[in-house]
Amino acid sequence: MSPCENDTPINWKRNLIVAWLGCFLTGAAFSLVMPFLPLYVEQLGVTGHSALNMWSGIVFSITFLFSAIASPFWGGLADRKGRKLMLLRSALGMGIVMVLMGLAQNIWQFLILRALLGLLGGFVPNANALIATQVPRNKSGWALGTLSTGGVSGALLGPMAGGLLADSYGLRPVFFITASVLILCFFVTLFCIREKFQPVSKKEMLHMREVVTSLKNPKLVLSLFVTTLIIQVATGSIAPILTLYVRELAGNVSNVAFISGMIASVPGVAALLLSAPRLGKLGDRIGPEKILITALIFSVLLLIPMSYVQTPLQLGILRFLLGAADGALLPAVQTLLVYNSSNQIAGRIFSYNQSFRDIGNVTGPLMGAAISANYGFRAVFLVTAGVVLFNAVYSWNSLRRRRIPQVSN
């Protein structure tokens, strides 16, 4: 039992602050190594342009693939043993794997460790489940929106810090620094997260069919999972072509990498500063379903003109506005999941949602790369807009016959 745990009532606001810090640290830890991942693959002995591209894509995607496979298992274990235990397992497990990555001697070892990283992940969905089961229902949107800014902040700062550290100390030491960040996250969680959880035996656990029947609206929950997948597909489809598209727009400039980095970062800045907590709080007042549909439509209206921009500045402005819309989407989905499931199955519901998110992280870049190879960069934005429009119609159809029940503390 940690020093913070006693018989006093749980302070969910303090847990939210500590969970936010944990999501920030894990978000930073994951993104610290991303700027130089292809360079590390090359250092491990992969040579040749095509081979380097192939292996870089594989080692990047395999983490999300194995995370999608493992998330439901960890979600079920969280519902049996408690969410705090899963947070500790995730932080410590990923920390150990990061150390081993820094010691990898060939590409196959690194590939296996990237897969293991996906298997042992799950800090963010379990943090979402923990806060969702403790926060008053009428504050769910604000709390989950605030929590989402932790991971976004870490993911924004991580690449910059990782690039500086790699330039200063080399590639391998960054993995050890990342491991230290994750171990710090482990101890912060151990000593300052509080959870009163009564373990449930395996026999008492609800089976899959019982989980589905316990949902207030199973079809709606499935549509929310699909929405999460499409959000990530839309985000990931642009990632592979963004730098090349910026270079096409900018022409012959020497700082195309810097410009691309800025344009890649502005959606996260917008989500952090403008939308996630504020629109989450608004969703608590007017209903998260209204926020979800409005943000999806707004995203479509911003993606279409991205295909016709003529300068990097125009693209940057549109991506900033898109970030403001995107920052409201996942918190709205998560709030609707809270409204439509019980605390007893929260771990599994959030883990299933994470699985769909990971599948989107894998398929989005593949879709974007395939479209750009066959039809050009600008077509990626139009196809992505069509996918998001389909999701808006699908979500509206799923939501229009339901009415959010009145919730109270």
UniProtKB/Swiss-Prot annotation:
Entry's transmembrane regions: 16-36, 58-78, 92-112, 115-135, 146-166, 173-193, 224-244, 256-276, 291-311, 379-399
Entry annotated with the keyword Methyltransferase: no
InterPro entries recorded: MFS, MFS_dom, MFS_MdtG_subfamily, MFS_trans_sf, Mutidrug-R_MdtG, Tet-R_TetA/multi-R_MdtG-like
GO biological process: response to antibiotic
Coiled-coil region list: none
Function (record text): Confers resistance to fosfomycin and deoxycholate.
Protein name: Multidrug resistance protein MdtG
Organism: Escherichia coli O9:H4 (strain HS)
Gene from which this protein is expressed: mdtG
